[in-house]
Amino acid sequence: QSISEQIKAFANEQGFSVEIYQSNHEGDIIDLIHKSKDEYDGVIINAGAYTHYSYAIRDAIEAVSDYTPFVEVHMSDIHKREDFRKISVITPVCVKQICGFGKDSYKMGIDLLLKIL
């Protein structure tokens, strides 16, 4: 079972559904973040390498954060990696950062969103 399938199954067990979106295009991610205000109760975001330098994604999250909570997740512990990976420009505009728990980072993000919502 893929990580996406496991996340969907876990969310369904908790009584709600999830949409999973992946893109290598920063503008597409920003468009989805802007849409989240009207379409999603909460968002779990793993911004990959964009985590470390995309002020555009950070600004998009900040613009909708009054309407939609964002939880930042990473499978690896970014704080135990190379120096440039220890920096997250999106953490300040997210409710919380969860990292270092492998695929369980996503489940922990779902649990946190359930508590917030």
Regions found by a protein language model. Give the residues of each.
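Short catalytic helix/loop segments, enriched in acidic residues and glycine
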Residues: Q1-N12
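Short beta->alpha junction loops
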Residues: S17-G27
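Short, acidic/small-residue loops that bind anionic groups at enzyme active sites
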Residues: A63-K80
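Short beta-strand elements at the ligand-binding edges of bilobed clamshell
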Residues: F84-K103
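A charged, well-structured terminal subsegment
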Residues: C99-L117
